Regions:
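Flexible glycine/proline-rich
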Residues: 110-262
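N-terminal small/polar loop signature for handling phosphorylated ligands or for N-terminal nucleophile
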Residues: 54-115
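Residue-level signal for inorganic ion chemistry
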Residues: 26, 60, 94, 197, ...
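Hydrophobic/aromatic beta-strand patches that form the interior of the parallel beta-sheet core
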Residues: 27, 68-71, 140-142, 177
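A general structural motif
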Residues: 47-53, 73-78, 121-130
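A generic local secondary-structure boundary/capping motif
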Residues: 10-18, 45-47, 84, 121, ...
């Protein structure tokens, strides 16, 4: 922080040990995806634009790390292995899609063929259940679901804390604040939900969380409009409006960075 640098100058420290910004490789997978340069394919209804690369690169920068885009790997194990090999030069790899069970989920097979060690797969959370984590040649690999909201939520809840650890931060877990629910909520019996919400400040200084709209895992606007994730614990009974729950504030726009990173 600026004033810490001032303190160092005050005590005559011209050089200090620091943590290098981790380099994070990002790989997306899918024959249906195209880059922004080929947006005409999207307009023609033949393809889907790759939004995850841009969103995750911005999230990695906001976390204080350096993103490296590995591009779009096609549904071919050779293509996936080639791009993953390039990512081994980085400090961490984030893959998007190919983390769930399905005939087109080739990332796991490609990783297995390269000697990947899977530490765990599946987390009892929604969205983001098919998240995976392991190591490839000593490099941590985070496997995110392909749906944009699932990818964004798992990054904030599971990947961001790991990046804080790599940066040498003492506080690695995402901070939470207590908020009141703005409506009755229906919890899931077997997993924690992370609802995208806006926090409204009340006259008495407390906050009320209200959903940003439909919460489908493909509705990226629900995350774009949110300033927090409301943590809804698993349970069998409805949660009445006004109940106090924890919320994870999402990173605010950086005043010093006007560029979107495109």
């Amino acid at each position: 922080r600026p004033w810490e640098i001032g303190v160092l100058a005050t005590v005559g420290r011209a050089r200090v040990r620091t943590h290098r910004r981790p380099r994070v490789a990002i790989l997306v997978n899918g024959d249906e995806l195209v880059s922004l340069e080929d947006f005409d394919e999207v307009l023609a209804g033949r393809r889907i634009v790759d939004s995850n690369s841009h969103a995750l690169a911005a999230a990695v920068r906001a976390a204080g790390c350096e993103p490296r885009l590995l591009g779009i790997a096609r549904d071919d194990e050779g293509s996936i292995r080639e791009r993953l090999s390039a990512g081994l030069e980085c400090d961490a790899i984030v893959t998007v899609a190919g983390a769930s069970v399905g005939e087109h989920d080739l990332v796991k097979r490609a990783l297995a063929g390269m000697g990947f060690r899977l530490d765990f797969w599946r987390v009892r959370m929604k969205p983001g259940n098919p998240f995976s984590f392991g190591h490839l040649d000593g490099v941590p690999v985070f496997g995110l679901p392909g749906n944009p909201v699932s990818a964004g939520v798992t990054f904030e809840v599971l990947v961001h804390p790991a990046l804080r650890l790599m940066l040498g931060r003492s506080a690695v877990h995402s901070p939470t604040i207590g908020v009141a629910t703005g409506e009755t909520l229906e919890p899931l019996a077997d997993r924690v939900q992370f609802l995208r919400v806006r926090l409204e400040k009340e006259a008495r200084g407390t906050f009320t969380a209200r959903r940003t709209g439909p919460q489908g895992s493909g509705i990226l606007s629900s995350l774009a409009r949110a300033d927090a994730l409301l943590v809804v614990p698993a349970g069998d009974e409805p949660i009445p409006a006004g109940t106090r729950l924890a919320a994870i504030p999402l990173p605010a726009p950086d005043e010093g960075q006007a560029s979107s990173g495109f």
